[in-house]
Amino acid sequence: MPKNKKRNTPHRGGSGGGGSGAAATTAATAGGQHRNVQPFSDEDASIETMSHCSGYSDPSSFAEDGPEVLDEEGTQEDLEYKLKGLIDLTLDKSAKTRQAALEGIKNALASRMLYEFILERRMTLTDSIERCLKKGKSDEQRAAAALASVLCIQLGPGIESEEVLKTLGPVLKKIICDGTASIQARQTCATCFGVCCFIATDDITELYSTLQCLENIFTKSYLKEKDSNVICSTPNTALHISSLLAWTLLLTICPLSEVKKKLEMHVHKLPSLLSSDDVNMRIAAGESLALLFELARGMESDFFYEDMESLTQMLRALATDGNKHRAKVDKRKQRSVFRDILRAVEERDFPTETVKFGPERMYIDCWVKKRTYDTFKEILGSGMQYHLQSNEFLRNVFELGPPVMLDAATLKTMKISRFERHLYNSAAFKARTKARSKCRDKRADVGEFF
């Protein structure tokens, strides 16, 4: 059999383990076959090793079918066995192998609650994450930081997550402030630092230190306003956005005295970011302003902002933006968000959103809750619904009470099959197409009449 074809042949059984040193010289598949191999090289890792852990580096392998995956495709023991193999692979010599292992563990933890399993191995995982953050390059650092966020979400507040933050915090801070590091890695580390601090820290000094670190990053965008009326985006803009959003998240758990102090410092400077030529920066600045106004009015119902007229004019312009030089998708996204921001600033109103997960519903009725939900949704992806059902920490954050216990039979009756989803989506698509066709016909008739 040709060499390349042999490598593409799928392995039978579960994933095998791999590592460095003596462990790297022998690999075994779950089918029971053993063979001698040489230590991994970066070139081999992308082909041979990925065949062992590709199922765990693909988000869809854990997240697509939700919490019922194990009932249908394996047992808890199978998953834990495979995760042990992935944890071993985080020590591999190949950077690609380590990255794939980190991503695989992250995807598993994002789609399942594995508290007991993680609790026993938290120090091993923390050491692996620290090593990958220190010695890895851009993609590996991003994967390690993303795993650190999910690890803290699994552990929840307590001594264990405090130990994780104590170990990883200085490393994350160093990467965030390192101008020579990859922008993508710094961006993910900024989000991770904010989330881990939100979950784990009980030390007010540490909270203020994290706020200051993030503040030092995004406030660099303020400096450009002196040179021009429009803030031009730079490669660092994405980092500034992540730092601003993480800073805003942490502000929601600060004492009122610190919130008041930060309000006085930033409420007059943040509007300058609304003139950025990056749509994501404009949206992040607008949502942060709305949240700051909400916090300010929570402290003082008669909160007064001197430049209210100028601010509302700017928000109204963004809510009705018709600039032909901007992409249609960006304009549509921006107008939708800034309509809500304008209502929040002018009328103190928030359009309530409903999030459904299983038999439960959660109402997002304020900017603080929206910022919190959006942050964890970004990290957990499609696993957010499962964690809202099962993760006690998230249920406490969103005041959902203890997890609702449902037996397997009840869950099965509630689950919609893929075929039923397909039929529903097809009918909705057909109805939407007909409605839009009628609108297009009317516009065409009007054009011909005139």
UniProtKB/Swiss-Prot annotation:
Residues 22-32 have a biased composition (Low complexity). Keywords: Developmental protein, Differentiation. The keyword Cell inner membrane does not apply. Signal peptide: none annotated. Residues 1-10 have a biased composition (Basic residues). GO terms for biological process: cell differentiation. InterPro entries: ARM-like, ARM-type_fold, IFRD, Interferon-rel_develop_reg_C, Interferon-rel_develop_reg_N. Interacts with PSIP1/LEDGF. Belongs to the IFRD family. Could play a role in regulating gene activity in the proliferative and/or differentiative pathways induced by NGF. May be an autocrine factor that attenuates or amplifies the initial ligand-induced signal. This is Interferon-related developmental regulator 1.
